């Protein structure tokens, strides 16, 4: 959890926002996935948001669903994902690592065991996409017991009560949705979220990172101008992987270029 606090403190001192890429662990293969993650970090990623492939990802559009299918085809399991996480943490000791996943994977070996495993490999936060705040108590309790930040999604239509609850119980960062629906770079709609960010700040919530449909530097600038601490981009990155599966060198070059440009937008 402290890695997020350190990150936001360092970025504030430099007057920068955070750029956080999302990828599925093991896509398209475990070995190339580790190279991809090294490339994202070298190109300027401030933190990582990583998915554990799941067979029924309700919040994800086709791009990220296909990433999970590629990982499954490469034989990726939750066990392999945790081995990869341990390797990433060993190589990159300071970068915040967040998991974005689904409840079935948490339930599989028991909630407490799952968070213990996360702590053992150096994961900083967990966001469970299909658990609404109202049902989050057993998850957030176990998370805090093991020093893991529970991350909550703040939807664009959140009422005051929900904003207070998210501010009170969230740690690390707050995942601010650009819009309702599923993930996807092709779904551009960005709502004016200034009022939500103002309220979250008023209630002392963890810093807001805006996600869903973030695929261009200009959108990063808009998020920061609205008061967000940074932006998360997933589908646009995963699409680069999908389009270059057979040419890894080109894939890594395009990923580096994309992240460099998105990170540059956090500095203006």
UniProtKB/Swiss-Prot annotation:
Stretches that traverse the bilayer: none
UniProt entry keywords in alphabetical sequence: Amino-acid biosynthesis, Aromatic amino acid biosynthesis, Lyase, Tryptophan biosynthesis
Family of the protein in this entry: Belongs to the TrpA family.
Protein's UniProt keywords contain Ribonucleoprotein: no
UniProt function note: The alpha subunit is responsible for the aldol cleavage of indoleglycerol phosphate to indole and glyceraldehyde 3-phosphate.
Domain of life: Bacteria
NCBIfam families tied to this protein: trpA
This protein's name: Tryptophan synthase alpha chain
Pathway: Amino-acid biosynthesis; L-tryptophan biosynthesis; L-tryptophan from chorismate: step 5/5
Enzyme Commission code: 4.2.1.20
Residue numbers annotated as active site: 49 (proton acceptor), 60 (proton acceptor)
Catalysed reactions, semicolon-separated: (1S,2R)-1-C-(indol-3-yl)glycerol 3-phosphate + L-serine = D-glyceraldehyde 3-phosphate + L-tryptophan + H2O
GO MF terms held by the record: tryptophan synthase activity
